[in-house]
Every structure is written in structure tokens, then in C-alpha cells.
Amino acid sequence: WLIFTQQFDTIYSTNLNLWRRTHMKYKGTLIVVKDCNRALKFYRDMFGFQLLQDNDGNMELTNNLYLQESGYWEQFTKRSVIPNSNQSELYFEEPNIEQFVERLETLYPEIEYVNHLMTHSWGQKVVRFYDLDGNLIEVGTPI
């Protein structure tokens, strides 16, 4: 029994390590933008993201957010970018949401809202808007 258990542990351990090395991992979210520098400024101003790497039209930011300019996206995918498509959203939590909205309106008065600041029936305050390139963003208070 001891030999069987040791063999099983060895096989299990080997397979687990192999699985860890070969299976993919989620690494982040890429959003398409017209101008990476303009988008970087927006995400830095509003959310505190910092630039990690700049590859001329492709940027890696902190918190695993990636920016790619629309020209590259359309060249690689052979598909058009569809701003304001409402297919997904970037979600953030902010305990001082009123302050956040005030900063957003001061720095980016042209921002397009989907929902102005509102309170859900469960008590969470949220605001939804598009970034400068039509990517949907939701900011809510922690639940």
C-alpha cells in the first residue's frame, strides 16, 4: 500500500506540475483605441494606471490592461472596430464615487454617459460611461 501511495503521489505530482506549465493563464484585457497616448492619459488621470511598456501602437499598463491602436487591430483582424458596441465593460469599484464623477466631469466634460450616477435597489451606487474611444466603463461603490 505504501509503494502504491508513493507511486500515485509521484504520478499526481508530475501531472499537476505538467498541467501548471502547459495550461494557459488569463493575462489581461486588451481594448482598442484610436490613440494610445491619449488613452493612456485618460486611464492614468481617472484610474491611476501606469505605462509598463510601449511598443509603438501597443501599450501594456499596470493591472493587466493593454491598449492597441485601431489601425493595428484592423490590420491584424481584418475587421472594423465598433465603438459603443455595449458588448462588454471594464468594471471598477470606488468608495468615493461622487468625487470620482466630479473629477471625470472636470477633466473630461465631453464624456458620454450610459447611466449618470444612480443607486441600485440593493444600495450600490454606479455610473456607466464610454471612454474616449467608445469602450464601456462601469464604476460602482464596493458591494
Question: Where are the model-predicted features located?
Answer:
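Short, Lys/Arg-enriched N-terminal segments with co-localized hydrophobic residues
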Residues: 1-23
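Vicinal oxygen chelate
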Residues: 7, 16, 101-143
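N-terminal beta-strand motif that seeds the catalytic metal site of vicinal oxygen chelate
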Residues: 16-38, 88-90
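Amphipathic alpha-helical segments
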Residues: 35-49
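Conserved acetyl-CoA-binding loop of GNAT-fold acetyltransferases
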Residues: 45-52, 108-111
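Conserved short beta-strand elements that form part of the metal-binding/catalytic scaffold
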Residues: 50-84, 136-141
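Short beta-strand micro-motifs in enzyme catalytic cores
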Residues: 59, 88, 123-127
